[in-house]
Regions:
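A short acidic, glycine/proline-enriched capping/turn motif at secondary-structure boundaries
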Residues: 74, 83-85, 122-124
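Catalytic domains of carbohydrate-active enzymes, especially glycoside hydrolases
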Residues: 60-81, 286-291, 354
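Generic alpha-helix structural propensity
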Residues: 56-63, 71, 80, 96-103, ...
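Glycine-rich, proline-tolerant flexible connector loops at the mouths of alpha/beta enzymes
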Residues: 80-93
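Aromatic- and Gly/Pro-rich amphipathic surface segment
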Residues: 31-66
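Active-site region of glycoside hydrolase catalytic domains
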Residues: 1-45, 88-90, 98-460
Length: 460
């Protein structure tokens, strides 16, 4: 076999609570920011589809876990819903939620599938957002209590915990670029939200370590390598600034226990530093992780700015760089993202060379395609493009592992076609096709290919 992976390699996929569970307003669950935003502005959501039903995992969990086993998963990552487990954000636990999550965890283990559990995947309870969300340190403390509750309830069986999934995304979406609630454009508030998210992460890590639970705790970051247009110093500096803002603002605190000095100096120059309090530095140091999840979809290509900044305009990341459309790059036209498989190699070798080669795994990697019904043959979607996408990324991952990178697994996004926030079900990502009208599940060709790859621990 040409591409054989290490023994005990994690083969699986990932999803999140809000994107798959459905029953968003049932079972004792309170509203998240997404439920409220959809109520207020349904026209912003593709085809007017909100989070109420999604992929109905809440009702079909046993069937779906059987499909995971059929797809030869030995591991699977999903998230818990804070709004479902503790509807008021703090205080009483919802027994219906405890029962549901116990069923899911126990069934995964019964089928030989290791659960990887994320505490927060973009789904802020509205009662917490009304207090200011991550702008309010009271919400940081509440998250720590929520995390402790999760560890107490499920820590006897869950051995792989992740505090956040892609914590930079709610910062970008909610406070810079208007694709998450609360739809604010304000860099200073964005910096505060990012900083408090790191504090929330560290608070949860402290709680986990204090409980002396068996297993490991980490975080899932979407890492987008920043490539300069050229080696001209101005382009290189532009890429460095993009890397500081979008990658190292979370990567350095969770792996090194501190922020990059360059990032602190940069934010200070533009008067964008968040307010710090005594004890924050030690808290951040205490938030260093055991395991890093890496979500990789696309690179970020940048260049120095072609024009001067308008000094009257609000400060934004783009004051520091312009995006660069590299000629000839391979694109996914449905998502508008570049497909660049070597990026996965560059990420893990950077971790090896500059971050002490931490334990890590690919926690998401995938391709969303619109109107996959075009590719149905004999009742099955023949998504050869997804097989090609996965295999190319796995080849580069294999190369990094063979060169000493401590990468322990590969999880695809995603198991079943799911609800993708504002995009609804526009682009499909799953190994399993979901018919929205009937909720029928049908394994795609890529699912069969992945099952064979996982079973043989590699491919030719």
């Amino acid at each position: 076999m040409r591409y054989r992976f290490p023994d005990n390699f994690w083969w699986g996929s990932a999803c999140s609570a809000l994107q798959t569970e459905g029953d968003s307003l049932n079972g004792g669950k309170s509203q998240t920011t997404w439920d409220v935003w959809f109520e207020r502005q349904p026209g912003r959501f593709h085809q007017g589809i909100g989070p109420a039903e999604t992929s109905t995992l809440y009702r079909h969990w046993k069937q779906d876990i059987a499909l995971l086993k059929q797809l030869k998963h030995n591991s699977f990552r999903t998230s818990l819903s804070w709004a479902r487990l503790i509807p008021d954000g703090v205080g009483e636990v919802n027994p219906q939620a405890v029962s549901f999550y116990n069923h899911v965890i126990d069934e995964l283990l019964a089928q030989g599938i290791t659960p990887f559990i994320t505490l927060f995947h973009f789904d802020m309870p509205m009662v917490m957002q009304e207090k200011g969300g991550w702008e309010n340190r009271d919400v940081v403390e509440a998250f720590g209590r929520y995390a402790q509750t999760c560890f107490t309830l499920f820590g006897d069986r869950v051995k792989h915990w992740f505090t956040f999934n892609e914590p930079i995304v709610p910062v970008e979406g909610g406070y810079l670029y208007d694709f998450h609630y609360p739809n604010v454009v304000d860099f200073k508030r964005a910096a505060t939200v990012a900083y408090h998210t790191v504090l929330a992460h560290s608070t949860a890590v402290r709680a986990w370590r204090a409980g002396r639970y068996d297993g490991e705790i980490g975080v899932v970051l979407n890492l987008t390598p920043s490539y300069p247009r050229s080696q001209h110093p101005a382009d290189v500096q532009a890429a460095h600034h993009a890397d500081l803002l979008f990658n190292r603002s979370f990567l350095d605190p969770v792996l090194k226990g501190e922020y990059p000095a360059d990032l602190v100096a940069l934010l200070k120059t533009y008067d964008q530093l968040p307010a710090c309090q005594p004890g924050d530095r030690q808290l951040i140091t205490d938030g260093k992780i055991d395991l890093l999840g890496i979500n990789y979809y696309q690179p970020r290509r940048v260049k120095c700015r072609d024009t001067a900044v308008n000094p009257q305009a609000p400060f934004m990341p783009e004051w520091l760089f312009d995006y660069y459309d590299m000629p000839g790059r391979k694109m996914n036209p449905y998502r508008g993202w570049e497909i660049y498989a070597p990026g996965i190699y560059d990420i893990i070798t950077n971790l090896r060379d500059n971050y002490g080669n931490p334990r890590c795994f690919i926690s998401e990697n995938g391709i969303g395609v619109e109107n996959e019904q075009r590719f149905v043959q004999a009742g099955q979607i023949h998504d050869d493009y997804r097989i090609d996408f996965i295999s190319e990324h796995l080849k580069w991952l294999h190369k990094g592992i063979s060169e000493g990178c401590h990468c322990l697994g590969y999880h695809m996004w995603t198991f079943i076609d799911n609800w993708s926030w504002l995009n609804g079900y526009k682009n499909r990502y799953g190994f399993v096709q979901l018919d929205l009208a009937t909720q029928t599940r049908t394994v795609k060709k890529s699912g069969e290919w992945f099952a064979a790859t996982a079973e043989h621990n590699g491919f030719d």
